[in-house]
Amino acid sequence: MSGPGNKRAAGDGGSGPPEKKLSREEKTTTTLIEPIRLGGISSTEEMDLKVLQFKNKKLAERLEQRQACEDELRERIEKLEKRQATDDATLLIVNRYWAQLDETVEALLRCHESQGELSSAPEAPGTQEGPTCDGTPLPEPGTSELRDPLLMQLRPPLSEPALAFVVALGASSSEEVELELQGRMEFSKAAVSRVVEASDRLQRRVEELCQRVYSRGDSEPLSEAAQAHTRELGRENRRLQDLATQLQEKHHRISLEYSELQDKVTSAETKVLEMETTVEDLQWDIEKLRKREQKLNKHLAEALEQLNSGYYVSGSSSGFQGGQITLSMQKFEMLNAELEENQELANSRMAELEKLQAELQGAVRTNERLKVALRSLPEEVVRETGEYRMLQAQFSLLYNESLQVKTQLDEARGLLLATKNSHLRHIEHMESDELGLQKKLRTEVIQLEDTLAQVRKEYEMLRIEFEQNLAANEQAGPINREMRHLISSLQNHNHQLKGDAQRYKRKLREVQAEIGKLRAQASGSAHSTPNLGHPEDSGVSAPAPGKEEGGPGPVSTPDNRKEMAPVPGTTTTTTSVKKEELVPSEEDFQGITPGAQGPSSRGREPEARPKRELREREGPSLGPPPVASALSRADREKAKVEETKRKESELLKGLRAELKKAQESQKEMKLLLDMYKSAPKEQRDKVQLMAAERKAKAEVDELRSRIRELEERDRRESKKIADEDALRRIRQAEEQIEHLQRKLGATKQEEEALLSEMDVTGQAFEDMQEQNGRLLQQLREKDDANFKLMSERIKANQIHKLLREEKDELGEQVLGLKSQVDAQLLTVQKLEEKERALQGSLGGVEKELTLRSQALELNKRKAVEAAQLAEDLKVQLEHVQTRLREIQPCLAESRAAREKESFNLKRAQEDISRLRRKLEKQRKVEVYADADEILQEEIKEYKARLTCPCCNTRKKDAVLTKCFHVFCFECVRGRYEARQRKCPKCNAAFGAHDFHRIYIS
């Protein structure tokens, strides 16, 4: 029955497996039952009865194990349910707070977007910023990926039941949950980044407003104190913002560290839980081993009962089963011998342990005794130690340092007094600065209100001026159009007058050339004809220059006739001189620029007078006297001359009156020209000036026509005069004509001056036209400036609103600063109280310091002596240390030799035990004389060696490569899977690749 028993015993190692192996063993089809010896059976009914009893016992054991496993599994299920409940609660809390965070961030974003729309409405469209810095708009909370149904289940509102979230988690896979949660985390990050960007945008806007306030403060006449105060407030604001950002960074860093520590705590908790689970597994293994031990104890009791029954059978029966019973008795004796050997070995080991325990207790006692001796050391021994001397040296050093500290303490006292005084002064300065800042703030508020009132007044003035300018521009439109038409017509008229003047100049040159020819002919005929022909030729040739120069003058009085009585040839000479003068005057007229015509025309009048006087002096000495030819005809023409004389005198009177009128009109023209030059260039004055110019030109044309008529009449009447009286009258008339010609030359010069002034006025008119164009351009620019002023006014109103808000904020900041100042005053009072307490403690410390300084002075001498002793002991210590270094290798060698001896002793004991076993075997050989029995016994021993020492049922078919001990593969694998990864014999640890199958043939 040993064969089937061994086959059935293969399931011994699988009894009572751990929890992790239950599922694997449930899949196996074979049920492993331990072998049991039924003993002698007489019938099949008895065999069935014993088998049923054995099955019932096994089922009872399995039932107990099953109940224990169920209890343990129930406990673990409860723990897992609790853990799942806590995990669900944490997940729900995280989900709720995450949803609250998303809602608050969305509310903040909506608030910032509404504020951004309100603030960006008055700004230019080019200055508006996008939602993000790089231009990529973030998805809206309602239009993003979060509209997916699964993510909407993952992020329910607060009113939704919490089961929906858990159901969504259970319904979706881990990958889907991870993807959706990653999208939700990206949305939260994007929303938070948008909030941060909005805060940065608000910060930039505040800085821009501050810059505008500074620029406005630079442009407006604000006080320097207010500007400095605003700058200080701006700097303080920036400092507080930097401090806030630093604190936020610090808070963020601390929160990250806190989260890391929390993660570490959670990981540690999970490790603790894992360790608890491992402890539970170990406890389960211990329970398993305990159950196995109980089972083995039961088997041992049964075996003892069977042995007793075997003794009884061997005593009662004869030789039927005698060989088998004697063999079991021998095995039992061998087991008893091995048990005795093991007991002896255990007793020896116990003796060794007791010996080591006694040595340990002795060492502990010596240690305690040395501690007590160390506590109650005498002073002399302490003084002789090197540590004491080192302490003395250190004491001397510390004494010197204490002296230095004393000096530093004195300095600190002085510094404390100085700091106290400076602190008091600083407090006074702070109070005075606070009062000054309050006054400055009040004055600044008053100034801001004044500036606001001034800005309102300026706005009203600008609005009124803008309305007036609009009305004036609307009224001046048709007037400007009329003035443009009038200016264009006057320009055309000026061009026509210039053409007429050129034509008249050309005719004047032609007439002067004809006069020269006639003079040459007259001079030739005067030499060839008789004396009677001279007066006629002279009379004919005399009026020609007058015609060309502009007409004769009035007849002179009888006194003038007597003065002008010399030779009648003076007319020709005077006309020739006038001709010579006219040519350069025309050249001068053509060479004068428009800007210099006025002064040159005025300067010709004083130059013409000496020339006329020179001609009057040269005139009598040039021509021959024609008096003899005129005496014969004087009587004939006497009556006619008297009539003509009366007519000419009347005519001359009329001409003189017209000449006076022309001179008066010329004076009026000069006055108008002076007024035009001095007065501003306006349109109505120009129109009046042009009208006066036309009138003067019309009068000049009338005078020219009348002079021509008078010349023609004079030419007709001069042919009739032949006698002396006529010649005398002619001479007088010629003198008067010459005088009138002089006046005519002066009037021509004045006319030329007037023409030049007309050119100047034309040029001035063109300049005025250009100026009108510039004025129109300026009007357009003014309109643009008015529109710009209106836009700037709108912006100023917005800035004023912002400034008012900033003013309110500054008022709140001032209140906060006042509260801070009060808190600082309280802290200052507390610091003063602390300072008083410190001064009291400082006095006590000073007293203690004086006492200690005295003690230090007393101990100074001892320190010197201790230093000398320390040097001596130092030498001795070095000597002892050298000896100790020499002794240490010897101690190490002796320790190694002792360990070697102990190892050899253990080996000797093992050899003794092995030899003892051989001796017992030899004794068995001596006892058993039969060789078959000896061989059978050796075969059993070899089989026992080939069986696994752990389960004692299976063959050895696995080796551990760490220590090369051999076991069965099932035991090794069971130990590996049960996490008992140590060799059963030598406790050497092994891994998954450290055991392999072997095949023993």
UniProtKB/Swiss-Prot annotation:
InterPro entries assigned: E3_ubiquit_lig_Bre1, Znf_C3HC4_RING-type, Znf_RING, Znf_RING/FYVE/PHD, Znf_RING_CS
Q: Which Gene3D superfamilies match?
A: Zinc/RING finger domain, C3HC4 (zinc finger) (3.30.40.10)
Q: Does the keyword Lyase apply?
A: no
Task: PTM N6-acetyllysine: list the residues.
Answer: K20, K355, K517
Impact of altering C111M?
A: Abolishes interaction with RB1
Protein location: Nucleus
Positions of crosslink type Glycyl lysine isopeptide (Lys-Gly) (interchain with G-Cter in SUMO2): K578, K579
Which reactions appear under catalytic activity for this entry? S-ubiquitinyl-[E2 ubiquitin-conjugating enzyme]-L-cysteine + [acceptor protein]-L-lysine = [E2 ubiquitin-conjugating enzyme]-L-cysteine + N(6)-ubiquitinyl-[acceptor protein]-L-lysine
Expression (tissue specificity): Ubiquitously expressed. Expressed at higher level in testis, heart and pancreas, while it is only weakly expressed in lung, skeletal muscle and small intestine.
Zinc finger annotations (RING-type) as residue ranges: 948-987
Give one GO molecular function term: mRNA 3'-UTR binding
Polar residues bias spans: 522-531
Q: Which residues form a coiled coil?
A: 44-91, 189-377, 437-525, 627-946
Q: Where is the composition biased (Basic and acidic residues)?
A: 18-28, 602-619, 633-652
Matching Pfam families: zf-C3HC4
Q: Keywords on this record?
A: Acetylation, Chromatin regulator, Coiled coil, Host-virus interaction, Isopeptide bond, Metal-binding, Nucleus, Phosphoprotein, Transferase, Ubl conjugation, Ubl conjugation pathway, Zinc, Zinc-finger
The record's section on SMART domains has: RING (SM00184)
Q: Where is this region: Disordered?
A: 1-32, 116-146, 518-652
One biological-process term from Gene Ontology? protein ubiquitination
* A GO-annotated cellular component: nucleoplasm
According to the record's subunit comment, the protein's assembly and interactions are: Component of the RNF20/40 complex (also known as BRE1 complex) probably composed of 2 copies of RNF20/BRE1A and 2 copies of RNF40/BRE1B. Interacts with UBE2E1/UBCH6. Interacts with RB1 and WAC. (Microbial infection) Interacts with human herpesvirus 8 (KSHV) protein RTA/ORF50; this interaction targets the SMC5-SMC6 complex for proteasomal degradation.
Q: Which PANTHER family match?
A: E3 UBIQUITIN-PROTEIN LIGASE BRE1B, RING FINGER PROTEIN-RELATED
Q: What does this protein do?
A: Component of the RNF20/40 E3 ubiquitin-protein ligase complex that mediates monoubiquitination of 'Lys-120' of histone H2B (H2BK120ub1). H2BK120ub1 gives a specific tag for epigenetic transcriptional activation and is also prerequisite for histone H3 'Lys-4' and 'Lys-79' methylation (H3K4me and H3K79me, respectively). It thereby plays a central role in histone code and gene regulation. The RNF20/40 complex forms a H2B ubiquitin ligase complex in cooperation with the E2 enzyme UBE2A or UBE2B; reports about the cooperation with UBE2E1/UBCH are contradictory. (Microbial infection) Promotes the human herpesvirus 8 (KSHV) lytic cycle by inducing the expression of lytic viral genes including the latency switch gene RTA/ORF50.
Q: Which family does it belong to?
A: Belongs to the BRE1 family.
Q: What is this protein called?
A: E3 ubiquitin-protein ligase BRE1B
State the encoding gene.
Answer: RNF40
